[in-house]
Each structure stands twice: as structure tokens, then as C-alpha cells.
A protein has these predicted regions:
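Membrane-interface helix/loop caps of multi-pass membrane proteins
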Residues: 2-378
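Extracellular/periplasmic envelope-modification machinery, especially enzymes
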Residues: 253, 316-320, 324-327, 334-335, ...
Length: 704
């Protein structure tokens, strides 16, 4: 929600406006606690900020004062930054204490972004879901996106209004009418952009451009206010209706936001701002002392309530607030906000020594320096810890490579003790203990184990666990496949060698690509890959989205026009809410691919859940071949017969990797001292690299 900033101008004090802020703050609290009503607080607070700022600016300009952009900026941010900085510092400290280590870097990034007013753009960049129901997984600083948006407008609006005033005076125009005209145009242009912009990712909620029209509408109405006078009785009647509309939106979910529907509560808010001074029932309700008191501290309430909500849910390991604890946390939030207002906000805002432009600038500079220095010191600590974890992981990969090079460790279960030359009556020599970080090799090793140290990778190195390749794919592949956004098109090896093609989503990238590259390096193949996040390779399926369906169709077209020797793909699809199934139309897809002359190598998908498997595993201590959190295989994977329809297709070879994910009916999250998953469903690069030698040997066996 946008922060309910108190008017920074000397305007006639109106208790009803403070009461209006309180109503909107209650809407924010109820929505954040229980998703009650429509998220209109963001829109209504924008209206109040723009309306009051513009009203004051026009009054000063009409009185002959020269607009001072610097004074406006320093007045605004002197008031906003100190409470914000304290909130960020305390929240970051509490987050380090309560949140999993893998989330610490995100908190540091958001702390920097919040203090420098671009948090909304950061959240849009990482595709944050504002309406996610599991608040425990939300960032404790997520709510400050709105403060960033307002901060951007508080920088832009004074400069824009000052420029309009200067030009209006030079052209002999009315300042009020010029400002009205400018903001009417901005309102129209911004609304047109909002209505015509596609938002498949849902990140438009954090986009400043999506709410410029709301700022502009508030400014336009403020400029037009003198022409909107009504008789006292009519003004009071309009205020009552407006308050009723606002309360309705506070209690009932109506429309989508941001969107044109926001115009209704915005106009209701405008009516209360315009006509509330006429008194009457609406003004009387809004001037009720408890509401006025809440309105006076609404900025601080907004700052502190969300971190309190989220960190409480993390501490008690719950996804949502109940009625009792929700109300209790609201009371706590109000109490903390009252302290923050009394000892930080009010003194800085009201003491005479803090009101010169120089002093205001010094307060802003000192506050920013203290806040950014605090966050930077934590960042340095994370860098040091991350570097230590990275070096530890690199050492583990060296021991893993040594283990993988020994055939007895790679796939000893594949050896048939009853085969020719082996006497089943003679007990085999005992195998040496498996040590170090063998990863997947431990899942198939029948001997003893002697693991020491923590499982890898560490929580601060998970960003390095995504498989990345630098090689470019061929020109024909690029021409067809790169027309689809966020498609990875990679090439590895000598293009004149026999060719392997890997297609699929990030699951294929994490599991199949390490094996394909190892096979290329050892046996002299050229590997080409077309990988698209969130888009498993299957028959083109409209349900997967136009872009994904187009990508998959382009892959098949490419293979038909540029035949390859081998194609690697994942032929099943797991689900967090059901049992594994064959990929959509995968039988027809394999038939189409083999018709090009390619041999198809298929494996099954890895585990997919609603639980952060890394965090779950990190709380356990592995001391056998597998450990961490143990999941029940039948809950996620189908029986082995799921592959039967594909086995009848000439040119298809199934490579079984299920024993690298599960042992019997138990699926661990740590194997051979290596974390298998980095989140809810992606295999770590480290584990994928330990799988690669085993998969390569099995591919060779399948092709014999």
C-alpha cells in the first residue's frame, strides 16, 4: 500500500482528513491480515498526497511566491526518511535472525532499494506476487514498494509543477488552469497506457507508470477545486455518499488493481477532500477522536505493521494470520508506531531548528549515510560468508569428481554378481567407505559411508547453482528459437561432430545439460540446446501459453529442417499437487522427432513440491547415503509403467534415473552430502554434476 504521508504544507488543519487516513489505514491492515475488501488504500493515499501537494503549490504560486523545488524536496524527505531508515534497519536485523539464510541477500537488496526509493522496480524485476496467500514467504520489506513509488512522484511532481508555473507566467496564462490542463493530459495518457498494456507476469502492480494517472487525477481535481463548490446541504450529502462508497470498497472485493475501477474510490476520496469542510455526518464520523489519533500516526503504522505481520508468521511457522493474533498484531503495530511517531517523526517534523533548508538537507544526508552504511556492513558480512561457502563448495566438487572417476563408485549396482567370471558362492571383498561429497553416486553405492562436514551448496551460494552456458547455438537454431522471449539457445563442442539436441525447461537444463556436455567432452559430440524457463518440451499446447506453445512448435520445426543424431528430453511432468504424468502429447512428440531420423533419449522429471526443499533439508543432518527431508515417492511419482507407451516407439530409449532421486519409496533431499534441490523443484547444479557420469554411462548402455 502507498504510505499515508501527512501533508507537508501549512494548510488549514482538518481532523476529518486525518480520520480519512485512519479509515484507509484500517483497510490496509485488514487487507494485509485477512485479504478483506479491495486494495484501495494504495490508490486513495495517492489521491490525498497529490491533492494536498498540488493545492498548496497552487496557493503559493497564486500568492506570487516563486516555486522552490529544492525546498519542497528537502521538506518532504526530511520527514519521510528517518522513520523509514529506522524501520528498514530494525526489519533487516530481525530478518537476519528469523529468516532462512538463503533469503538474507534478498533482504539486503531490498533494504538498499527501499532507502533509495526504487523498491517497486526491484520487486517488479523479480516478479513478486503481491497477492500471494502465504505471507510467511513474503519479504518483510515488500510493503515499501509503495513508499518508493511515492518517493519517485515526490521528486517528479514539484519539478513538473514548477516548470508549468514558470511557463504559464511567461505565456500570461492562469497558473491554476495551466496545472489543470497539464494533469488532465497526463491522466488521460497514463490511463490509456494502463488499459492497453498487457501484463502476463502480474508485475504491473509495482509499476509506477500504472499509477501516474492517480497522482495526476488528484492534482487535476485540486486545480479545479474552486469551480466545484456546492451548497452546504448538497456538499454534506455528497460526503455521506462518498464515505459510504469508500467503506463499501474497504469491505468488499471489487475490481482489479491497479485499473480503471480505482477511479470510483478515488472520486469518493476526492469528494471527501473537497466537501468535508462543510461538516455534516461524514465529517463528524471522520473527526471522531480515535480515528484522528490513528490518522496522526498512520505513516508509522504503515511502516511497521507489515514487518511485524510477516516476521510473526515466520516465527510461529504459519502461512496466514487468524482473527485473534491478527487483531493482537494490529494493536502491537499501533503501539510501536506511536513510539516511532513521538520520538522520531514528530520532533524532526516540528522542531524549529530542523526547518531551514540547510538543516533539512543535513538531516537527509545523515539519515541516508547511517542507513546505507548499516546495510552495507551487513552486505560485507554476507560477501565474506558467501565466499567461504563458495570455496567450500568448490573443494567439495573436487572430491566429487574424484569419486565419480572411480567405476565402483559410479554405478556399482549395475554390476551383475552372477555374471560370467564371478562365483556367487564367494563373498566379494568389502567396499571402502564412501567419503567426501559423492552426491548421486551415494544413491547407488552399496558400501559403507563416512561423511563429514556440512552438505553443499551453502545457502548463500544458491545463485551459483543454476546451470549456465556461454556457447551460442547455430544460426538456423537462433533464427527460429530466439524469437521467443527468455529462450536459452546454447551450443557446445565442434559443430561438425555428431549432434545432440536438448530441449525443455529449466528442469532439463539442470539435469540433462550436465550429462550432455560430459558426453560431448568424452565422446566427441556437438550439443545444442533450446531451453525455456517454465516451458517443458511437449507437443504444442495452447494451455501452456502462446509463447511456450510457439517455442515448442519452433523446436520441432528446427529438428525437421535440421536433423540431428540424438535428442534428449524429459518425458514426464511432476506436480506439486498431484502424481507425475506423461508430458502433454509426448508420445506424438517422440514419434515426430524419431521421424526426423533422430534417436530419442528420455528420462523422467524430478520432484516438484510446494515446500522449499533446500530449507527443509538444511534443518537435517545427513549421515547415510541419503537424508535431509524424506518424502514418500508414491505421493509424487507414478509407477514405472508410466513409460510403457513410449517404449513401443522405434528409436526411443528410456534411461532410468529414478534411483538417483529416490531409494525405494523414500525420496531424500540430501544425497552423498550434497543438497539435491535448490528450491521447491529444481535440482542443484552441484547434484546435477554428480548425476552426469551415471547418466552418461546409462545412455551408452542404452545405445549399445
Amino acid at each position: 500500500m502507498v504510505v499515508p504521508v501527512v501533508a507537508l504544507q501549512k494548510t488549514p488543519h482538518r481532523n476529518d482528513i486525518q480520520g480519512l487516513r485512519a479509515v484507509l489505514m484500517l483497510q490496509v491492515l485488514f487487507f494485509h491480515a485477512w485479504f478483506v475488501g479491495s486494495p484501495i488504500g494504495v490508490d486513495a493515499f495517492i489521491m490525498i498526497s497529490a491533492f494536498l501537494m498540488t493545492s498548496s503549490f497552487i496557493r503559493r504560486s497564486e500568492a506570487g511566491a516563486t516555486p522552490s523545488v529544492l525546498e519542497r524536496w528537502t521538506t518532504t524527505f526530511k520527514r519521510l526518511l528517518p522513520p523509514l531508515t529506522i524501520t528498514v534497519a530494525v526489519t533487516l536485523t530481525a530478518s537476519i535472525a528469523l529468516l532462512p539464510a538463503r533469503r538474507w541477500q534478498d533482504m539486503v537488496d531490498q533494504s538498499f532499494a527501499s532507502l533509495t526509493y526504487w523498491q517497486n522496480w526491484l520487486l517488479a524485476h523479480v516478479s513478486t506476487d503481491y497477492f500471494a496467500e502465504d505471507h510467511a514467504l513474503a519479504s518483510p520489506l515488500q510493503h515499501l514498494w509503495s513508499m518508493s513509488m511515492q518517493g519517485q512522484m515526490f521528486l517528479l511532481w514539484p519539478a513538473l509543477m514548477a516548470l508549468t508555473v514558470v511557463l504559464a507566467r511567461k505565456m500570461g496564462l492562469s497558473v491554476r488552469r495551466a496545472i489543470f490542463g497539464v494533469f488532465v493530459v497526463i491522466t488521460a495518457l497514463s490511463l490509456i497506457w494502463l488499459v492497453t498494456t498487457s501484463d502476463p507476469s502480474g508485475t504491473i502492480y509495482f509499476d509506477t507508470r500504472a499509477r501516474i494517472w492517480e497522482f495526476a487525477l488528484g492534482s487535476a481535481i485540486a486545480a479545479f477545486a474552486p469551480y466545484l463548490r456546492l451548497p452546504t446541504l448538497a456538499a454534506r450529502a455528497v460526503s455521506v455518499v462518498a464515505l459510504g462508497v469508500l467503506v463499501l470498497f474497504c469491505l468488499v472485493s471489487i475490481g482489479t488493481y491497479p485499473g480503471p475501477m480505482a477511479a470510483v474510490p478515488l472520486l469518493a476520496t476526492s469528494a471527501l477532500l473537497l466537501f468535508g469542510a462543510a461538516g455534516g455526518p461524514a465529517a463528524g464520523v471522520l473527526s471522531w477522536r480515535p480515528l484522528v489519533m490513528l490518522g496522526n500516526i498512520s505513516y508509522s503504522v504503515y511502516l511497521v505493521h507489515w514487518p511485524i505481520f510477516v516476521l510473526y508468521l515466520v516465527a510461529v511457522d504459519r502461512e496466514a494470520l487468524g482473527v485473534v493474533d491478527g487483531i493482537a498484531l494490529m494493536v502491537v503495530s499501533v503501539a510501536v508506531a506511536a513510539v516511532l511517531t513521538k520520538y522520531v517523526d514528530s520532533p524532526i517534523r516540528s522542531l524549529p531548528w530542523a526547518n531551514t533548508t540547510l538543516r533539512k538537507t543535513q538531516i537527509i544526508g545523515l539519515t541516508l549515510w547511517l542507513g546505507l552504511t548499516f546495510v552495507f556492513n551487513i552486505q560485507v558480512g554476507l560477501w565474506k560468508t558467501s565466499d567461504a561457502q563458495f570455496r567450500y563448495a568448490e573443494d567439495s566438487r573436487a572430491t566429487s569428481d574424484q569419486v565419480s572417476a572411480q567405476p565402483a563408485f559410479v554405478d556399482v549396482l549395475a554390476v551383475d554378481n552372477a555374471s560370467e567370471g564371478v562365483d556367487p558362492e564367494v563373498e566379494p571383498a568389502p567396499l571402502p567407505p564412501l567419503t567426501g561429497f559423492p552426491g548421486a553416486a551415494a544413491m547407488v553405492y552399496p558400501g559403507p559411508f563416512a561423511f563429514e562436514g556440512e552438505a553443499v551448496p551453502g545457502p548463500l551460494t544458491l545463485d551459483n547453482e543454476w546451470v549456465m552456458y556461454e556457447g551460442k547455438c547455430s544460426d538456423p537454431a537462433r533464427a527460429l528459437l530466439l524469437q521467443h522471449a527468455k529462450t536459452g539457445c546454447h551450443g557446445h563442442g565442434d559443430p561438425t561432430n555428431p549432434r545432440i539436441f536438448v530441449g525443455g525447461s529449466s528442469h532439463a537444463e539442470q539435469v540433462l545439460m550436465p550429462a550432455a556436455r560430459l558426453l560431448a567432452d568424452q565422446d566427441g559430440y556437438y550439443v545444442e540446446a533450446a531451453l525455456k524457463a517454465g516451458c517443458p518440451w511437449s507437443a504444442p499446447d495452447p494451455a501452456s501459453g502462446e509463447d511456450c506453445a510457439g517455442h515448442n512448435a519452433a523446436i520441432l520445426q528446427y529438428l525437421q529442417e535440421n536433423p540431428v543424431d540424438y535428442v534428449f528430453l524429459i518425458v514426464t511432468a511432476t506436480s506439486a499437487n498431484g502424481v507425475e504424468q506423461l508430458g502433454h502429447g509426448v508420445v506424438e512428440l517422440v514419434e515426430d522427432v524419431t521421424a526426423t531420423g533422430a534417436t530419442v533419449i528420455g528420462i523422467r522429471d524430478n520432484l516438484r513440491t510446494n515446500t522449499d526443499l533446500y530449507q527443509c533439508a538444511a534443518s537435517q543432518t545427513p549421515d547415510t547415503s541419503y537424508g535431509g527431508c524424506l518424502l514418500n515417492r508414491p505421493d509424487y511419482f507414478a509407477s514405472d509403467s508410466i513409460i510403457d507407451p513410449l517404449l513401443e516407439i522405434p528409436g526411443f530409449h528410456y534411461v532410468n534415473v529414478m534411483d538417483l532421486y529416490c531409494s525405494g519409496d523414500v525420496c531424500p533431499t540430501i544425497a552423498g552430502n550434497v543438497q539435491i534441490y535448490l528450491d521447491t523443484n529444481h535440482v542443484t547444479q552441484t547434484y546435477g554434476q554428480t548425476m552426469a557420469p551415471i547418466i552418461v554411462d546409462r545412455i551408452r548402455d542404452a545405445l549399445k
